[in-house]
Amino acid sequence: MLNVCLTTYPARVANVPRVLDSLRTQTILPDRFVITLCKADERLRHIFDNMPDVEVLIVDDDTKVWKKFLPAMDALHMKHDDLVLTVDDDKLYPPQMIADFMWAHSEFPDAPISGNHYWHNGLKCHCGGCSLVQPRHMAGWQKYYAYWKQLPSDDMFYTMLAARNKFAYMQTATNWERTATPFNEGQPYSVHGMVQQTYLRTAKLFGWI
C-alpha cells in the first residue's frame, strides 16, 4: 500500500487542500493520505471531514517533522511491503512526482529514497518541479544538508531522474540502516535516526527531507 503522509499546524493548514489537490492529479495515485495532527491542533480536523481519501490521526505530543510518518506507521500497523511517502504542507507537487519516486524505488528497492533541492534566484526549490505555496527566501539552507557530506561515499548513489528537469535527481543510501544512530529526543532531526526508526518499523520510507 502506498501511503502519502504529512503533518500540519494552524499557520499552514490553509495550504493543505491545495497540496492534496496537487497530489490527487498524480500519474500514480496513492492508496491513502494520512495527516497527523497534535492534540493541541485537533480543532483543525474538521477541514478534512469531507475528504474520504484522507485519514486523520491525533497524537499527544508535537514531535515536529517526525509527526509526518512515525505515528502513521505505528497506528496503521504498516508492513514491510507498505510504502510511506512523506510530503510537505507548503509544496505543490507536479503530476509525475510520485511516479518518479516509484521509479527510484524500483531501481533501489531496499534503500530509503530522498528528494533533494536546488537553489534558483535566491529561492530554495524542490527537484522535479514542485513549488512552494508561498515562495520564500531560505537563508542558511546549506546547514540542513550538511549531513550528506558525513555519509560514506560508497553508501551513496546519485541517480538522474527524468531529462525533462535538469535539476532533478534522487539520492539513495543503501546502508543507512547500518550507519544509523539511535533516535533520541536530543537529536529529533537526525536523518540517520529517522531511517533507523523506519527500518525498525519495517515499512519502506521515501519522501522529502
Language model region names:
Residues 80-92:
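Short beta-strand-to-loop acidic/aromatic patch adjacent to the donor-nucleotide binding site
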Residues 125-143:
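Conserved nucleotide-sugar donor-binding
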Residues 1-15, 19, 40, 56-58, ...:
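Catalytic phosphate/metal-binding cores of nucleic-acid and nucleotide-processing enzymes, i.e., regions
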Residues 36-81:
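Active-site-proximal specificity loops/subdomain of glycosyltransferases
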Residues 31-32, 83:
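Residues at the starts of beta-strands that form the adenosine-phosphate
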Residues 95-119:
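Conserved donor-nucleotide/metal-binding helix-loop-beta segment in metal-dependent transferases, i.e.
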Residues 1, 7, 14-19, 145-209:
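C-terminal catalytic/acceptor-binding lobe
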